[in-house]
Curated annotation (Swiss-Prot):
Keywords: Cytoplasm, Lyase, Schiff base. Signal peptide: none annotated. This is Deoxyribose-phosphate aldolase. It comes from the Bacteria. The gene is deoC. It is an enzyme of class 4 (lyase). GO terms for molecular function: deoxyribose-phosphate aldolase activity. CDD domains: DeoC. NCBIfam families: deoC. Catalyzes a reversible aldol reaction between acetaldehyde and D-glyceraldehyde 3-phosphate to generate 2-deoxy-D-ribose 5-phosphate. It holds the Pfam family DeoC. Pathway: Carbohydrate degradation; 2-deoxy-D-ribose 1-phosphate degradation; D-glyceraldehyde 3-phosphate and acetaldehyde from 2-deoxy-alpha-D-ribose 1-phosphate: step 2/2. The keyword Zinc does not apply. It comes from Bacillus cereus (strain ATCC 14579 / DSM 31 / CCUG 7414 / JCM 2152 / NBRC 15305 / NCIMB 9373 / NCTC 2599 / NRRL B-3711).
Length: 223
């Protein structure tokens, strides 16, 4: 298995510098990761630098809380695509999900999907660590109904990250035709292999190089 082509090479910390982003971009070129996942201000730089390389440009929407308005998320999506993003990872309205406001949650996702239609893949971050199993299933069902391409476990900025159990539940819920992305706490090749075995079709990690080289000592924390 070519694990590199399943990895979104990620850097999303608030103190990320241009030098940090360039390092991630160069590593993505070298190891041929599926994408680089970066904050929106770096999208144009990444798109320019990765032109002609088989590496997608992924960014985040409504990140990390999901607490932006639907209109804001849709605008962020259009803006990111205009600057060169080919994948967007959006955070759901977690509070609305917990309130049982399925209509709002679905509309929130749907508007981002519509903004991205034909131009970028949409991955929906449900923030599993804050949800019950019933809420995880409902979030996945609403994501599929709204037309999302992927569901994703975590932002990497909340109380927990991906677990194999959550990946299995999400895969069972969405079926074979929607992607499942494991993110948050995936730091070693063993972690990544567990997620893929459980049903993940993409892995988000900042320790991507260590994962590919199977070097546990090189793994870094978080995003």
């Amino acid at each position: 298995m070519n694990i590199a082509k399943l990895i979104d090479h990620t850097i999303l910390k608030a103190n990320t510098t241009k030098e940090d982003v360039m390092k991630v971009i160069e590593e993505a070129k070298e190891y041929k990761f599926a994408s680089v996942c970066i904050n929106p201000p770096w999208v144009k730089l990444a798109a320019d630098e990765l032109a002609g390389h088989d590496v997608d440009v992924c960014t985040v929407i409504g990140f990390p809380l999901g607490a932006s308005t639907t209109e804001t998320k849709a605008f962020e999506t259009k803006d990111a695509i205009a600057k060169g993003a080919t994948e967007v990872d959006m955070v759901i309205n977690v509070g609305a999900l917990k309130d049982g406001d399925n209509e709002l949650v679905e509309k929130d996702i749907y508007e981002v999907v519509q903004a991205a239609k034909g131009k970028a893949l949409v991955k929906v971050i449900i923030e599993t660590c804050l949800l019950t199993d019933e809420e995880k299933v409902r979030a996945c069902e609403l994501s599929v109904k709204a037309g999302a391409d992927f569901v994703k476990t975590s932002t990497g900025f909340s109380t927990g990250g991906a677990t194999a159990e959550d990946i299995a539940l999400m895969r069972k819920t969405v079926g074979p035709n929607v992607g499942v992305k494991a993110s948050g706490g995936v730091r070693t090749r063993e972690d990544a292999d567990k997620m893929v075995a459980a049903g993940a079709s993409r892995v988000g990690a900042s320790a991507s190089v260590a994962i590919v080289l199977n070097d546990a000592k090189g793994a870094t924390d978080n995003y």
